[in-house]
């Protein structure tokens, strides 16, 4: 009986450990987060380790103005594309929220700095 109980506890520990691994992480972004940008990119890509169901993406610009951004796909995927972010000169925070495949809420922030345009006199 003691072996049975120990076996069940070991199996439970394995199941809990596997469940914890169901949360996903960002593997890379394009452009790279914290990269200085000459201008706003046409899209921003977020590559996750596992598929996520993105629920919202907003940008907070240097003036602290927040606006919703569109993204694709609307279904669960490991690669999320943010369409036409129209980043403003200065610091921009892309704040995203989604659901991992185990149903837990995940979120993060990407920082991009867009150079100020120089006007020619």
What role is predicted for each listed range?
Residues 17-19:
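N-terminal signal peptide c-region/cleavage motif recognized by signal peptidases
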Residues 1-8:
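Bacterial N-terminal signal peptides that target proteins for export
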């Amino acid at each position: 009986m003691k072996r049975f109980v120990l076996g069940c506890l070991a199996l439970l520990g394995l199941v809990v450990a596997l469940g914890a691994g169901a949360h996903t992480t960002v593997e890379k972004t394009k452009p790279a987060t914290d990269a200085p940008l000459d201008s706003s990119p046409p899209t921003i890509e977020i590559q996750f380790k596992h598929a996520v169901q993105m629920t919202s993406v907003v940008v907070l610009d240097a003036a602290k103005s927040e606006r919703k951004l569109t993204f694709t796909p609307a279904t669960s995927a490991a690669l999320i594309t943010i369409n036409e972010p129209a980043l403003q000169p200065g610091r921009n925070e892309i704040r995203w929220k989604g659901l991992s495949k185990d149903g837990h809420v995940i979120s993060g922030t990407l920082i991009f700095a867009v150079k100020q345009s120089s006007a020619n006199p």
